[in-house]
Amino acid sequence: QIGAKGDFAIPLMTPVTLDKERKELLNVIVAQINTVLYTIIPGMNIEVRDYGKQALDSGEDGWKVELMSAREGRYPIPIRMESEGIIKIISVLNALIQAFGNPSICLAIDELDAGIFEYMLGELLDIFQNSAKGQLIFTSHNLRALEMLDKESIMFSTANPENRYIHMKNVKGSNNLRSMYIRSITLGGQDELIYEETDSLEIARAFRKAGRSVRNG
C-alpha cells in the first residue's frame, strides 16, 4: 500500500472506490511518486485509471480507480502484474519521499530488500544515508546494506532472545563489514551467537528422505 497523509492508503492489487477528496489526493501522491520512480525505473510511470462513478457504502458519489504501470511504448497494465520488486518499491516510495525531506519523520520498513535488485537497494541506501533529513529504520536479509551503511548504523540479530540485537565489535575503518559478518557466522568472536549453526549433511539427508517419500507415495 502507498502511505500518505494520516492513515490513507491505496491497495495496489485491486481497484478501489474513493470519494472526491481522496481521489484528488491520490493524484497528488502519484505525481510525487512518478517524480522519483522515473529515475529509479527508467521509462516507467504510474497512472490512475478512472473507471467512472460508483456509489460508496454511504451512498455518496465515489469513483472506482486502479493504479496502472505505464512504460514507454507499451500499453498500461495493472500494478499487480509487475514484479515483486517493483511492487515493493512502489508500495514504500511515497513514505520514503516523505521521510527523505522531513526531519520529524522516522520511517520503519520490515524487509526493505524483499524482491528489490541488490544494486538498486544499495543505491537507495546510499542516497538516504547521505542526503535524507528523516530517519529510516529497516530490516534486511540482503548483505548489500553492510557495504553501503556506516557500521554505527547497523545492528545484527542474534540467536539469543534475551539479547536480540548487537553491534559488531572489533570493526576497524578498513574492515569489510560483509566479510566480517560471514566470518563471525563461521568462526564466532562476537558477544552473541549471530547464527544458529546448521548441518549441511543433515539437510541433504532430509532432502533425500523427503524425495523418497514423494516417490513412494
For the regions a protein language model found, what residue spans apply to each?
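Short, hydrophobic/aromatic alpha-helical segments in well-folded domains
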Residues: 32-33, 95, 123-124
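C-terminal lobe/lid and adjacent interdomain/linker elements of RecA-like ASCE P-loop ATPase modules
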Residues: 122-217
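Conserved D-loop-proximal element of ABC-family nucleotide-binding domains
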Residues: 114-118
